[in-house]
């Protein structure tokens, strides 16, 4: 009986060995075929094809940053900068002191940000292969990718500190990536990318796609924020220069850059100015009507923190005695 079992085991071992060798040999001679033909180089053969690559730099932002409730939970949750819906006090457990976030909560945001970063890297590299009419046309397009890469890394650094800096398309999977310091990321990526975007993005008003004033606003913010990691404060002067240029343009009615401020605060939040708000340096319009992939959540972000003003009778509009502008104020009773 023992010899039979032993013989059977030997047969099984040989069978497994033969199968393993067969699979191994097959993998060595496998020719992959892409029936769609949509490779990065194929798309880059035309300006229209390159546009489809460039469109993907915004996907991570829409999916995990601006317009998604989870990012709001991470940035505002556990603070006093919130209020729940009327008769919806259970949101205290979601955004308030009672919140208990999952340990892997950041994973989705992290993945989506790096998804966006990788598409930015692809768009930057592939731009040199596209038959643009002029160098200016190419730079205006690729400036969008530089801007978005800076935005992704700015949010990652300010929420997580040091992260992995990836400035080129990924060739090999690194299972043990290291972390770059926040200042290195600012100096090697965020600030240079925004400087490029400031130089080449158009002045025209746009939605989702950034304009020159979008890049200038982010550049001033990034240069100022870098002081947190740099005791020499070498980018503070640049932040001041950019901010002053924007202030002067605003005083001139936005003649050069489109920087604008409404005379009355009510106009900032007026429904009529919702889609085309002149004060916005960069705006992104949420999907309307409900679609797949839970994009409908985007349309309800305002409700996460919404509470009817009628529930707070002590909040009223007051008028500034100097400017005449109205603002929200609390009446202490």
Question: What residues fall within each predicted segment?
Answer:
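Short coil/turn linking the two alpha-helices of tandem helical-hairpin repeats
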Residues: 157-158, 164, 205, 225-232
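Bacterial Sec-dependent N-terminal signal peptides
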Residues: 7-8, 12-35
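Conserved, well-structured interaction surfaces
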Residues: 46-65, 87-160, 175-176, 181-188, ...
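Glycine- and aromatic-rich loop/turn segments at beta-sheet edges
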Residues: 164-169, 198-208, 254-265
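An aromatic- and glycine-enriched ligand-binding surface/loop that stacks and positions planar moieties
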Residues: 29-88, 194-196, 212-331
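Secondary-structure transition into beta-strands, especially the periplasmic turns and strand N-termini
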Residues: 25, 129-146, 227-245
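Short linear capping/connector segments at secondary-structure termini
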Residues: 36-39, 97-101, 167-174
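Single conserved hydrophobic/aromatic residue that forms the stacking wall/gate
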Residues: 1-13, 331-332
